[in-house]
A protein has these predicted regions:
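N-terminal leader/targeting and accessory segments in enzymes
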Residues: 1-95, 256, 354, 382-383, ...
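Phosphate-binding loop of NTP-binding sites
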Residues: 9-12, 93-227, 231-241, 429, ...
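Mobile, glycine- and charge-enriched loop segments
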Residues: 34-45, 137-138, 148, 152-163, ...
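Active-site beta-alpha connecting loops in nucleotide-dependent enzymes
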Residues: 48-51, 317, 336-410
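Short beta-strands and strand-loop turn motifs
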Residues: 71, 109-115, 188-194, 226, ...
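Acidic, Mg2+-coordinating active-site environments of NTP-dependent enzymes
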Residues: 74-80, 188-331, 356-357, 382-385, ...
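Short acidic-hydrophobic, aromatic-tinged amphipathic segments that line or gate anion-handling sites
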Residues: 87-91, 414-423
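ATP-dependent carboxylate/acyl-activation modules
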Residues: 114, 120, 318-322, 444-452
C-alpha cells in the first residue's frame, strides 16, 4: 500500500502552482506553526482573521521545513531557496482538506468518527484506548475537531491500522465537510443536546446538523447511537437505511449498562448483565461514553478482556473532568474547557457522586445559547440544587441566572461575582481540607485561571 504524497500529487489535487522545487519530493509531515517546525516538515501558511501565515514561509524554511504551501499574497516576494519547494494555491485551508482526503483514500482501515453535543472528546479518548488494545491507532489530539484540526490529524497517518477522529460543529454544513474528508466506516453520535442552539435555533436542527456525519459514511458503514437520547431514539426507530447499533441504560438497546455502581474509584457496571466494566471516572455521562466504546470494540473484534482493559486505563484529555488532588488536601475537578447545559449537568452529576467533604461548584457563563440562554442557565441552577451542592459560586453576567435558580430551588450558600479575581479571592477564603471543587464554564470565561490559583 503506497501511502506517500508527492509535490506533484499536491499540485494535481489542489490545482496549485509549483513556484520552484522538485515535483517528485515526498511530503510526509505537515505543520501550520513556524515555531513548531521539525526538520523536513511541510509548512502550510493558513490565513487567519488578523494575518496570513503564508507571509512567514521564510521563517519555516529557515527552521528546517523542506517546502511550503502558501496562498497568493499581494506584494509577497517569493525568494528561491535551493533544495526547497514552494507551492502556491488559491486557499490553503481548502487545500489542506483536499490533501487530507487524498491521504485518507490511500488507507483501507477502520475510521471511527465521533460527534455529539457533549462528551465527544472523552468518548474519543475511551474509544481510542479500547481500539488501541488490538490496532495501532491514531486519534485526534485534544479537541482539534474542526475544518483545520481534523485534516491535520488525517495527515499524521503513517503505518496506523485504525483512526479515531472527533468532529465538532456549530453551524450547518460543517460536519458534511469533515465527514466527506474522513469517510468514516463507523459514525458515533453521543447525544443531541443544546450546545450551539443559539446558532442552530432548535434541538431538531441540531439533530439535522449532527446527522450530516452520515453523508460521508462508507457504504457498509455502521452508526452507533445513544438510544436514551430522545431525538436519536426517535430517529433510530424511523431509520431503515443505515446499519445501527444502539447503547443505553433505560431504553432497550443492543448494549446496555446494567447493575451500575458508583465507587470511590469511579463507575462500575455490567454489559447486558455479563462482562464487568470499570470506568475510572464517576458519573452517568461516563457510563454512556464507555458504552459507545464497548460497541466499537465489539464491532472491531476487540476481546471482552481488552475492551474492559481499554476502558479502565483510558486517559482524559486536558481540562475535561480532570480530577486533581491539591497539596492542601482538597480535590479540584477541572472541566473548564467548555460548557453547555448537558455538559454542566454531567459535571454536576460527577461532583454529586464524589466522596469526601463539602461539594463546591464554581460555574460560569455558557456561550452560543441565543434566546435560550436564560432558560438553560436557570436549568443548571436547578440541577445544582437537586444534586445537593453545598456551596455554589458563579462568575459572569449569565451565570447570575444559575445562582438565582439555585436559590429558588433551596440552595442556600451562594456567591455571585462579575470578575474572576473577586471569585478567586472568595474561593481561597472558604476552601478547606477534603472539599471537592468543580470548575466549569465556557472556554472564553478563562476559568483555567481559577484552577491555576487553586
Amino acid at each position: 500500500m503506497n501511502t506517500q504524497i508527492t509535490v506533484k500529487d499536491i499540485i494535481d489535487i489542489t490545482m496549485g502552482k509549483l513556484i520552484y522545487g522538485d515535483e517528485n519530493e515526498i511530503c510526509e509531515n505537515f505543520s501550520r506553526n513556524t515555531k513548531e517546525i521539525n526538520q523536513d516538515d511541510i509548512f502550510v501558511g493558513l490565513k487567519g482573521d488578523k494575518f496570513d501565515g503564508s507571509k512567514f514561509y521564510e521563517d519555516a524554511l529557515k527552521a528546517g521545513a523542506k517546502g511550503c504551501i502558501i496562498n497568493k499574497v499581494e506584494g509577497l516576494e517569493i525568494k528561491h531557496v535551493p533544495g526547497k519547494f514552494i507551492i502556491q494555491v488559491e486557499d490553503t485551508v481548502k487545500a489542506i482538506g483536499q490533501i487530507a482526503k487524498f491521504k485518507r483514500e490511500k488507507y483501507h482501515i477502520p475510521v471511527i468518527a465521533i460527534t455529539g453535543s457533549v462528551g465527544k472528546t472523552s468518548t474519543k479518548d475511551i474509544i481510542y484506548s479500547v481500539v488501541s488494545q488490538k490496532y495501532h491507532t491514531l486519534k485526534t489530539q485534544g479537541n482539534l475537531n474542526n475544518h483545520i484540526g481534523m485534516p491535520f490529524t488525517l495527515l499524521r497517518l503513517k503505518d496506523h491500522e485504525a483512526l479515531v477522529v472527533e468532529m465538532g460543529m456549530n453551524h450547518f454544513g460543517e460536519l458534511s465537510y469533515l465527514t466527506n474528508i474522513a469517510q468514516p466506516t463507523i459514525a458515533v453520535i453521543t447525544n443531541v443536546g443544546t450546545a450551539h442552539i443559539g446558532n442552530l435555533g432548535s434541538r431538531e436542527n441540531i439533530l439535522k446538523a449532527k446527522l450530516e456525519i452520515l453523508e460521508g459514511l462508507q457504504k457498509e458503514g455502521t452508526v452507533i447511537i445513544n438510544n436514551d437520547n430522545d431525538l436519536l431514539h426517535k430517529w433510530q426507530s424511523e431509520n431503515d437505511h443505515y446499519k445501527v447499533i444502539t447503547y443505553g441504560i433505560e431504553n432497550p438497546s443492543n448494549y446496555m449498562a446494567t447493575e451500575i455502581e458508583y465507587t470511590e474509584a469511579g463507575s462500575k457496571y455490567k454489559v447486558n448483565h455479563n462482562e464487568e466494566i470499570e470506568v475510572p471516572v464517576k458519573g452517568e455521562a461516563f457510563v454512556y461514553n464507555s458504552l459507545s466504546a464497548v460497541c466499537v470494540g465489539k464491532l472491531l473484534g476487540v476481546s471482552e478482556q481488552d475492551i474492559a482493559k481499554g476502558i479502565k486505563e483510558f486517559e482524559l484529555s486536558a481540562m475535561r473532568l480532570d480530577i486533581q488532588k491539591s497539596e492542601y488536601g482538597y480535590t479540584v475537578i477541572n472541566d473548564c474547557y467548555n460548557a453547555n447545559y448537558d455538559s454542566m449537568k454531567a459535571a454536576l452529576d460527577c461532583l454529586s457522586k464524589m466522596q469526601g467533604g463539602r461539594k463546591i461548584a464554581i460555574l460560569g457563563d455558557m456561550g452560543e445559547l441565543g434566546e435560550y440562554a436564560t432558560e438553560l442557565h436557570q436549568k443548571v441552577g436547578k440541577v445544582a440544587a437537586e444534586d445537593n451542592v453545598d456551596i455554589l459560586i458563579t462568575v459572569g453576567t449569565e451565570a447570575k441566572q444559575i445562582a438565582e435558580a439555585a436559590k429558588a430551588n433551596g440552595l442556600e450558600k451562594i456567591y455571585s461575582f462579575d470578575e474572576l479575581k473577586d471569585a478567586i479571592d472568595k474561593i481561597k477564603k472558604i476552601l478547606a481540607v477534603n472539599d471537592i471543587v468543580l470548575v466549569k464554564a465556557s472556554h472564553y470565561m478563562n476559568f483555567e485561571e481559577i484552577v491555576k490559583a487553586l
